[in-house]
């Protein structure tokens, strides 16, 4: 490394210092998903980011998805994926595979990556410590022919109804980094598959997290010219949904951000997980790396 490169690194570290102080002892929930989960190099960069957050005095919590991996396993086992209104129908056999893939495979891969940095990660799901309880999701769609609203039966797809933060509070006082799969029990004894974005939002809300980061495959919220919004208020975000600037799959993502803020999260960021070290760029630099949504 040349002297100029060393000076550049030193300057970057010095610039990061006030942000390290700003987030010390703060909780940051990171929803990990999208393209980054399938790229080994990006996976290692993500693990290093989480490790550095912990070493800097931050309390990081990882929530992960795994839709493509679930689909691949169902195909491998000869089970056809069924969708209603764009949502996966999860019968008893499917939810068993979902739990196996999310809590048994993907979760442990992420834990191993973080542990390779020298930090201690622990794999969990909503069942552990009675952390999360769910109930059957209530979803409706408008029939395009009759224009009548009908209820979708998605099987064991759930919505979070209760978060007990006791276990997470204990882990926050330890050296452990929680990595959580979005699977949870219901009071009815069934296991439910929960959308990872809404699961992460529920966890962050229960903890009154300082930040909730959504790692996606896009840079953030874009205007009609394709330029990135660096920061939006909840009111501004709602107006952009109303006028069509925010559309398609970004609508439920932004609505989840708004729900998390209403639950007590101080700020939610949508950022590009395909950019190496995007978590550090967002937390420890002045301009961040995505779109910050605030109250």
From Swiss-Prot:
Belongs to the acetylglutamate kinase family. ArgB subfamily. One of its GO terms (molecular function) is acetylglutamate kinase activity. This is Acetylglutamate kinase. The keyword Hydrolase does not apply. GO terms for cellular component: cytoplasm. The record marks 31, 253 as: Transition state stabilizer. The gene is argB. It comes from Allorhizobium ampelinum (strain ATCC BAA-846 / DSM 112012 / S4) (Agrobacterium vitis (strain S4)). It is an enzyme of class 2 (transferase). It holds the Pfam family AA_kinase.
